[in-house]
Amino acid sequence: MLTILGFSMVTVFTILIMTKKVSPIVALTITPIVFALIGGFGKGIGDMILEGIQTVASSAALLLFAILFFGILIDAGLFDPLIEKILSIVKGDPVKIAIGSAVLAMLIALDGDGTTTYMITVSAMLPLYKRIGMNPMVMATLAMLSLSIVSGMTPWGGPATRAISVLGLDPSDFFVPLLPTMLGGIACVIFLAFLMGRKERNRIGIVQLEPRHITKDSSQSYMAATLESEQLKRPRLIYLNLFLVISIMVFIVLGTKHPSVLFLIGFVLALTINYPNVKMQKERIAEHSGNAITVVLLVFSAGVFAGILSGTKMVDAIAGSLISIIPSSMGGFFPVIVALTSIPFTFVLSNDAYYFGMVPIFAEAASAYGIEPVEIARASIMGQPVHLMSPLVASTVLLVSMLKMDLGSFQRFAVKWAVITSLVITLLAIITGAITIL
């Protein structure tokens, strides 16, 4: 009975998300409540919801302050000199332009938002692509792959946040062992950028451009994309801001304090240092709070879903049925199986449907083989390079529309590179021990 009820709940939730009948926040909250009532768990729903919310509270705090932290630093222009330097270095060489596109996208992807990453990358680099005749699909693919690595693996990025919150994990436990894989993934994307750029160089050669022509259109487009006035920029504070970012990241890796506490401190310091005026502080907080609150609400809704799924024991029943069909000899490979199946699953499912609907079931099934939930969480993000090609991803639709290209053509161009990246980071995760084979 519980197995049927659990599968039905996950199916209904997935359909609601896929058909966009309701928002993810509504689906995550209403669906489990309705099915809990059907199963006769009405009296315990309140306690289950509260327990689920308590489980994800630290993840919600992490997201809130990380988004605000990076938002303030982007406003202050911390990354502007690097963007301008990239534009001046790449000149008319397709290889340098491709690598510069990847580096820029990785930098912007630190804020965890695909829309911001694509808007700034495309606006800064597209004029160069057009001027020398490079294929803009190269830029689109590299921006997508860069986003999948940086935003996909950092604990404040969308996929990792969902996995961490739904399984009630500590962000540091998730991220620190994954850091070598992330760095390897970054190196992989840069190497792929070199290959794509070399192919374009063989096609069109190196185009000689005057320096003043290189950055003119790009700088104007970049400024239009950021939509920030000069009064927000703090060029004199750039080294202090850079020191602040590096310090926060070092402390996160060392695990001295919970990341949510570190990002809270970092956000408050960044806000105070760059915008000591109270009025400007309120304006900056208001500017970024919309995106932050939306994500936090999503996390708390995930807590409701996970709390009821766990409290009613539906997840145990579903996991039991999965365990029964997996040969015991394959149990030790479960994290690898999750990593490989995440490639097709996350393409046909939205992140909400996959992480909130399927990952908890995988984690519970894996526990029967002595595999920790955190390994399943890490394994589940290996398919993100392919996921970001999906038409279900709003930022991908934005990307192809900005470049005035057809989504199908983009998918055909990018699929090879995306699959390669997913397989490479999966292999790196196995080698470095982020996911294990028992």
UniProtKB/Swiss-Prot annotation:
According to its UniProt record, where is this protein mainly located? membrane
GO MF annotation: an example: symporter activity
The membrane spanning regions, by residue number, are: 22-42, 59-79, 89-109, 137-157, 174-194, 237-257, 258-278, 292-312, 330-350, 356-376, 380-400, 418-438
Please, one GO biological process term? transmembrane transport
One Pfam family, please name it: CitMHS
* GO cellular component terms listed in the entry, alphabetical order: plasma membrane
Q: How does it sit in the membrane?
A: Multi-pass membrane protein
- State the UniProt keywords alphabetically: Cell membrane, Citrate utilization, Membrane, Symport, Transmembrane, Transmembrane helix, Transport
Q: What are the subcellular locations of this protein?
A: Cell membrane
Q: What is this protein for, i.e. what is its function?
A: Transports the free citrate anion.
Q: What protein am I looking at? A: Uncharacterized transporter YraO
Source organism: Bacillus subtilis (strain 168)
Q: Which gene encodes it?
A: yraO
